From Swiss-Prot:
Disulfide bonds: none annotated. Expressed in the dorsal organ cool cells. In the antenna, expressed in approximately six neurons in the arista as well as five to ten neurons near the third chamber of the sacculus. This is Ionotropic receptor 21a. Glycans are attached at N325, N469, N533, N558, N583, N588, N765, N797. It is found in: Cell membrane. Integral part of a neural sensory system in the antenna that provides the neural basis for the response to environmental changes in temperature (thermosensation). Together with Ir25a and Ir93a, mediates the response of the dorsal organ cool cells, a trio of cool-responsive neurons, to cooling and is required for cool avoidance behavior. GO terms for molecular function: glutamate receptor activity; ligand-gated monoatomic ion channel activity; transmitter-gated monoatomic ion channel activity involved in regulation of postsynaptic membrane potential. The lineage of its organism: Eukaryota, Metazoa, Ecdysozoa, Arthropoda, Hexapoda. It comes from the Eukaryota. Disruption phenotype: Strong disruption of larval thermotaxis when exposed to a thermal gradient ranging from 13.5 to 21.5 degrees Celsius with mutants unable to navigate away from cooler temperatures and toward warmer temperatures. Reduced response of dorsal organ cool cells to cooling. No effect on humidity preference. It comes from Drosophila melanogaster (Fruit fly). Keywords: Behavior, Cell membrane, Glycoprotein, Ion channel, Ion transport, Ligand-gated ion channel, Membrane, Receptor, Signal, Transmembrane, Transmembrane helix, Transport. It is a multi-pass membrane protein. Residues 722-745 are annotated as: Disordered. GO terms for biological process: detection of chemical stimulus involved in sensory perception; modulation of chemical synaptic transmission; synaptic transmission, glutamatergic.
């Protein structure tokens, strides 16, 4: 109770004191009227009304001081900021945004220097943001202004002038103009800072305008009811292909407030298409291009035509579609009149964006990358030549086949040139060879017999019986040389006949230029221009004589039907190999010929899918192709296609001829066939042909000579008749008439004897004259050999002349010639009708 009484006493005392203060009055000085008017003070507050007369400035009322604050008083800093129209909250928001942008630039954009774009509205209203950002950004950057039409004043920033990547930071009042400024961005990271509302930002992220900007981060300010508090910044991105229609949905990542992220573990640029394409259906244009795309037409049970596809690219894309959760709708590429090839038509469809993907074994080239995009190469291919090659050299070439033509030339020079040193060492002179072709012929047959072992010379006058050591050494060297050569020759013939000999094939550009081939290629698909400006000299020479055809079948037809000039066709090696395997066999072409693909690649290419430019699904499909290559799935697909589509009816894989496949022949022991020995028969047939030709020429020559004699005789008889008629007035005497008849009979008799003389007798007379020329000089003086055909020179038969001949062989030769002359005289007497006497029986 004592506590209550004490409190009551204190409260009563305080109440009385307050009442006393109110009743007490004190005099204060009044404020002058000049100060009140100058500072516009309240006259009622500053006590002007209480001052009267001359003492108006002597009293004023002091302001009552209350120690307890009531309400929410503003700090002095805020009061000063309001007086100078400075918003401290906006200043803090600016610093917060600058800190957020600096954090994003340092953590996500440091590898790719950012390009900062800002429009005129942001520059004028939020100029303090740009100023602070340019001063504090920790990495290298570019910046440029956007004009009123939302176009960058410096457009070079958006083009890649080098291989370095770029990123973008945009300060825009209208987020819908982002793609107009930057265009599609599938790889670069884009940060958009906008003052628009959250609803407008969500509309932008859901629209088609943001579908081509893959790595997009949008920063929007969250509006609150109390504008004096710090407002957070919300960070958005979008999810591409959220459903089967390919639409986008906005995604909230995190927020930024008080210098930190609410969820700092979140990646601000997450990977897209982690769950695929949500069953989206891609439109694909394809054309038949084996072995990459097979177009197979079949009939179902009802008789309706069915079209199905197969091949390396089809199976690869089907595998990727299952992994990325999308479906494909393949349509056959239509034929257009304004395009020259199927690939050009597919590229036009891609540029027009009527299809999403194009596949037809398309080569990745610089020209196609200018108007469209292509995937990474999934299969290698090369441009190769196809020619008509022989499986083996013909067997009739076995005679000349063992040696090349330089060896044959060297052998001919050695053996024909060996005539002169052998003759000179044996006779120590070459005078008897000059003009005597018979002796040269004998020596030729001698060296031919040495080489072929077909003849043996054991006569007294053969070189093998010579007594001179130099001749024997020379013949011995030729004999050793001949043994080695004949051994090589016979062994090579055996190998050539029993084993196949493969001819040279065309495997390079130099082979085509050296063998004078006609070369052709396609006039569409880029083949007509790819090698036009080549700096390779052989390629430029080859392109100058290039012929262009409309299809691959036409080119292969030119190869198989080439007759006088060989033809080579340049095309895809994979396609040519399949066409040869499926359409051409040994029976279709020849038993000895085959279509050959060059081993050397004329140009190496990579095959890929065709996409529209800046397509967002290209990067994901490229990553799957690289993964399939790394894991060996593409090699597995190639083997499966080869097994299913390129298998013969017997179960074996079809083989196209190449240098290796031509040589992959199982060798086995076998007997020689007629085809193996046809060279011998052809050689014999050649001999018969030459003999028949000589016989025909002799018959024609004999008939011609006979006709000439008849014509000459008729002319002489006509001339004699004319002379007799002209001299008919002059009569011959009996002696003159008898002499005239005798000469006439002798001429007729000589003509009949010459006609009866056979070919062998004439050659025997020629041989006798030749022997006289060779051996007659040893025992007889120089005689006129020009008269040998008229008068037979008598050889010396006395013992005195024979003693003058020292050489025994020469004496034997002269005796043989003498006996030959006697025999010839006897033959002449037998053929002379005047030597016989005919009696008439009475």
């Amino acid at each position: 109770m004592s506590y209550y009484w004490v409190a009551l006493v204190l409260f009563t005392a305080q109440a009385f004191s307050i009442e006393g203060d109110r009743s007490a009055s004190y005099q204060e000085k009044c404020i002058s009227r000049r100060l009140i008017n100058h500072y516009q003070l309240n006259k009622e507050i500053f006590g002007v009304g209480m001052c009267d007369g001359n003492n108006e400035n002597e009293f004023r009322q002091k302001r009552r001081i209350v120690p307890t604050f009531q309400g929410n008083p503003r700090p002095r800093g805020e009061l000063l900021a309001s007086k100078f129209h400075v918003n401290s909250y906006n200043f803090e928001q600016t610093n917060s945004l600058v800190g957020l942008v600096n954090k994003i630039a340092q953590e996500y954009l440091n590898k790719c220097p950012p390009v900062i774009y800002y429009d005129s509205f942001v520059e004028k209203s939020d100029g303090l943001i740009l100023e602070n950002l340019f001063k504090t950004i920790p990495i290298t950057f570019y910046h440029g202004e956007i004009n009123a039409d939302y176009e960058a004043k410096n457009k070079r920033f958006t083009s890649h002038i080098d291989c370095n990547c770029k990123s973008y930071i945009l300060f825009l009042s209208d987020p819908l103009m982002t793609r107009k400024i930057l265009g599609p961005q599938t790889e670069s990271r884009v940060v958009l800072v906008s003052r628009s509302t959250q609803w407008r930002l969500r509309d932008f992220l859901s629209s088609e305008l943001s579908s081509n900007i893959v790595n997009l981060l949008v920063i929007g300010e969250s509006l609150m009811a109390d504008p004096m508090r710090e407002r957070p910044y919300v960070l958005y991105t979008h999810k591409l292909y959220a459903d089967g229609l390919g639409s986008n949905t906005p995604v909230v990542l995190t927020s930024w407030i008080k210098g930190a992220l609410s969820r700092p573990h979140i990646n601000l640029f997450p990977s897209k298409f982690q769950f695929g394409f949500a069953g989206h259906r891609f439109q694909i244009s394809a054309a038949n291009q084996p072995p990459f795309i097979f177009r197979i037409r079949t009939l179902d049970s009802s008789g309706m035509g069915q079209l199905r596809w197969d091949g390396v690219e089809f199976r690869l894309l089907t595998m990727i579609s299952k992994r990325l959760n999308f479906s494909i709708d393949i349509t056959e590429t239509p034929t257009r009149s304004n395009t020259r090839g199927v690939v050009d038509t597919i590229q036009e469809q891609i540029i027009e964006r009527t299809v999403d993907i194009g596949m037809s074994g398309i080569y990745i080239t610089q020209e196609r990358l200018m108007d469209s995009a292509m995937s990474v190469g999934h299969s290698p291919d090369c441009a190769a030549f196809i020619t008509l090659a022989s499986k083996a050299l013909p067997k009739y070439r076995a005679i000349m086949g063992p040696f090349q033509w330089p060896v044959w030339v060297a052998l001919i020079c050695v053996y024909l040139g060996g005539i002169f040193p052998i003759v000179f060492t044996d006779r120590l002179t070459l005078s008897h060879l000059m003009g005597n072709w018979g002796e040269v012929e004998n020596m030729f047959w001698y060296v031919f017999g040495m080489f072929t072992n077909a003849f043996s010379f054991t006569g007294k006058y053969s070189w093998s019986n010579t007594r001179k050591n130099s001749t024997r050494l020379l013949i011995g060297a030729y004999w050793l040389f001949t043994i080695i050569i004949t051994s090589c020759y016979t062994g090579s013939i055996i190998a050539f006949v029993t084993l196949p000999a493969f001819p040279d094939t065309v495997d390079s550009v130099l082979d085509l230029l050296g063998l004078f081939f006609r070369v052709g290629t396609l006039n569409n698909g880029g083949w007509e221009t790819w090698f036009q400006n080549s700096t390779h000299i052989p390629t430029s020479r080859l392109y100058k004589k290039m012929e262009f055809v409309g299809s691959v079948d036409e080119g292969i037809g030119n190869v198989t039907q080439s007759f006088f000039w060989n033809y080579a066709f340049l095309g895809s090696k994979a396609q040519l190999e399949y066409l040869v395997q499926s359409n051409f066999s040994d029976e279709n072409i020849s038993r000895r010929s085959a279509l050959h693909l060059s081993e050397e690649c004329f140009a190496l290419f990579q095959i890929g899918f065709l996409f529209p430019r800046e397509s967002v699904y290209k990067i994901k499909i490229d990553s799957m192709i690289l993964l399939a290559q790394q894991s060996g799935l593409i090699a597995k697909i190639n083997n499966e296609v080869s097994w299913v589509m390129q298998r013969s009816s017997s179960g074996r894989l079809l083989q196209a001829s190449s240098s290796n496949s031509l040589r992959e022949i199982i060798q086995e022991e076998r007997q020689l066939t007629t085809a193996d020995t046809e060279g011998m028969f052809l050689l014999m047939a050649l001999g018969y042909f030459l003999g028949a030709t000589a016989l025909v020429s002799e018959i024609v020559g004999g008939i011609t000579n006979k006709c000439r004699q008849i014509i000459k005789r008729s002319r002489k008889s006509a001339a004699s008749s004319w002379s007799s008629a002209s001299s008919g007035s002059m009569l011959r005497t009996n002696a003159e008439q008898l002499s005239h008849d005798k000469r006439k009979a002798n001429r007729r008799e000589a003509a009949e004897v010459a006609q009866k003389m056979s070919f062998g007798m004439r050659e025997l007379n020629l041989t006798r004259a030749t022997l006289r020329e060779i051996y007659g000089s040893y025992g007889a003086p120089e005689t006129d050999h020009g008269q040998l055909d008229i008068v037979h020179t008598e050889f010396p038969n006395s013992s005195a002349k024979l003693n003058n001949i020292e050489d025994e062989e020469s004496r034997e030769a002269l005796e043989s010639l003498q006996r030959l002359d006697e025999f010839m005289d006897q033959m002449d007497n037998d053929g002379n009708p005047s030597s016989h006497t005919f009696r008439i029986d009475n």
